[in-house]
């Protein structure tokens, strides 16, 4: 699989990193980072106790939403919420009345309550949470989205199913992670 440099993609769409505050992404990343307390693990040795997988992905989502004035985002795989929160931040910063639909069977209510203590409430106002497997939820959604992110179950069959179920749903951009 070919590695894609996010900075190259940002240049392709003429989006300047200097136009945004990376501190906002750091702040969201801090609260959504996976925690690893095992000081002997390779992850801890290379990333410290916090691990921010695909940090640049949030910047790309933000750039696409603000640059192209996208109004709808479908996310398969909420995980710790980084992508959805970056999308919500983009909607807020660009003054877009946007909508986020996120699908994940493992969304935890307690985790969301904790996040709400640190992340602006307005970010959550535009997010609809669907606590189901994508294979069950997607066939029930009869609409299109400007941006779709497939980042759920990473097995071949699950990704193939997510692709089959979303290929007619995205209008402008599709991201696989």
Where are these regions (language model features)?
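Rossmann-like AdoMet
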Residues: 1-52
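S-adenosylmethionine/decaboxylated-SAM
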Residues: 44-52, 56-177
């Amino acid at each position: 699989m070919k590695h894609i440099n996010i900075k190259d993609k940002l240049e392709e769409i003429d989006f300047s990193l200097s136009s945004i505050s990376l501190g906002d992404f750091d702040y969201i990343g801090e609260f959504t980072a996976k925690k690893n307390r095992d000081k002997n693990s390779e992850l801890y040795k290379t990333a410290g106790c916090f691990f921010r997988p695909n940090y640049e992905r949030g910047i790309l989502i933000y750039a696409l939403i603000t640059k192209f004035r996208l109004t709808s985002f479908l996310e398969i795989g909420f995980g710790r919420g980084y992508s959805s929160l970056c999308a919500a931040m983009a909607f807020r910063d660009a003054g877009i009345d946007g909508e986020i639909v996120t699908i994940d069977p493992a969304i935890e209510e307690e985790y969301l309550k904790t996040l709400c203590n640190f992340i602006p409430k307005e970010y959550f106002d535009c997010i609809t949470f669907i606590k189901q497997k994508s294979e069950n939820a997607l066939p029930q959604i009869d609409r299109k989205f400007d941006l779709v992110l497939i980042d759920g179950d990473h097995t071949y069959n699950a990704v193939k199913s997510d692709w089959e179920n979303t290929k007619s749903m995205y209008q402008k951009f599709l991201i696989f992670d």
